[in-house]
Amino acid sequence: MDRFTIKGPVKLQGEVEISGSKNAALPILMATLLTDEKCVLNRVPNLRDIRTTFKLLEVLGKKVEYNNGTAVITKNKELNSILPYELVKQMRASFWVAGPLLARLKHTQIPLPGGCAIGVRPVDIHLQGFKKFGAAESTKKGDVVISADELKPAKIVLRFPSVGATINIMMCASLIPGKTIIENAAKEPEVEDLICALKTMGAQISIDSKGRIIVEGKKTLGSMTHTVVADRIETGTFILAAAATKGDVVIKNCVPEHNDILLENLKDAGFGVSVGQGRIHITAPSNGKIKPVGIRTMPYPGFATDLQAPYMVLLCVADGGSDITEDIFENRYMHAPELVRMGADITIEKTMAKVKGVKELSGANVMASDLRGGAALVIAALCAAGDTVIDRVYHIDRGYENIEAKFAALGAKIVRDNPLKD
């Protein structure tokens, strides 16, 4: 397996361009299953999860051509409703094909998905929505089987504003003639980007003044042409890398308002934050000291759970102590013991992490256990004195395009290798 060797400390300097959002591209790619027409998606990042999705689409009957960030999806054969476990186990987002397949075929059989091992991430909210449409659910040899004789529009109230459930239910509703109302829906930019993509296919979707998603379903949808929104989590990761290393970095081709909460926290912590059209400039505190500012993860527009791990690194090098409360996922502090190996002072108490800043982190051998935790270890390595070796970087490759090249362009000394191939 590949690993990173990073020599620190370094103050990052320069400019970095943000890729298209993985979390937006994935559901939009799944949405191509809603039509037999040609779909063109631009700014698609070249990532492991994206490549897995291409394979899923091909198994289900699509032809996928990908070149230079543009994916062209066309019909190859009749849709298949059954997914292979070998692909589904690699990625939790694979369950997002359920909505389109149920809408098109009235039947789908999907193994329970894989992805990062972050606590309990159930699909029950998705299934409750499908039941409201008239579908029945059963299990068969570890697979979830969802089927219906007829699907009808419905009013659906989500018990939690789940991004995945909102996406799945909305895609399914777009092919159920009549009005579907989704209450307590997720408000993430990735949901809004999917809505934009579905509209190019002819879907009629709106968000009312109460935040409800209103879908006027159609019998068929047409072709799609869409450009994926900038990745707000990659943006936040580079913001935090610049901050933790007390660097001077301009982040380009981003959407600054998607990280408003994070930027406000950095201002409170003493950092220079300058925002322009599609760009963010981060500079170190004028007095050289990072004021500790605690966070609580919440659904958007609150603090993103996907940035909790990178933010913890910032607190590890701050002047003083502060707390992190993780209210979205269970067991999302798996990176903390690895940071402790590097000299961090972190105490975990159920959903809270108490972090006391230390004078300096030290290089160590550590292991990425999930995508965002892996990114946090990269930032910690950039702050640490000496060499840090990060194993299992395949987790990081799931969500960051050319991460080592982007950090190297900012002055990082980062090398990828595979010791088993040497």
UniProtKB/Swiss-Prot annotation:
The keyword Chaperone does not apply. UDP-N-acetyl-alpha-D-glucosamine binds at R92, D306, I328. The active site is at C116. It is found in: Cytoplasm. Coiled coil: none annotated. Keywords: Cell cycle, Cell division, Cell shape, Cell wall biogenesis/degradation, Cytoplasm, Peptidoglycan synthesis, Pyruvate, Transferase. Its EC number is 2.5.1.7. GO terms for biological process: cell division; cell wall organization; peptidoglycan biosynthetic process; regulation of cell shape; UDP-N-acetylgalactosamine biosynthetic process. One of its GO terms (molecular function) is UDP-N-acetylglucosamine 1-carboxyvinyltransferase activity. It is an enzyme of class 2 (transferase). The modification 2-(S-cysteinyl)pyruvic acid O-phosphothioketal is found at C116. Pfam families: EPSP_synthase. InterPro entries: Enolpyruvate_Tfrase_dom (IPR001986), Enolpyruvate_Tfrase_sf (IPR036968), MurA_subfamily (IPR050068), RNA3'P_cycl/enolpyr_Trfase_a/b (IPR013792), UDP_GlcNAc_COvinyl_MurA (IPR005750). The keyword Cytoplasm applies. Phosphoenolpyruvate binds at K22, N23. Belongs to the EPSP synthase family. MurA subfamily. Cell wall formation. Adds enolpyruvyl to UDP-N-acetylglucosamine. PANTHER family: UDP-N-ACETYLGLUCOSAMINE 1-CARBOXYVINYLTRANSFERASE (PTHR43783:SF1). This is UDP-N-acetylglucosamine 1-carboxyvinyltransferase. The lineage of its organism: Bacteria, Pseudomonadati, Elusimicrobiota, Elusimicrobia, Elusimicrobiales.
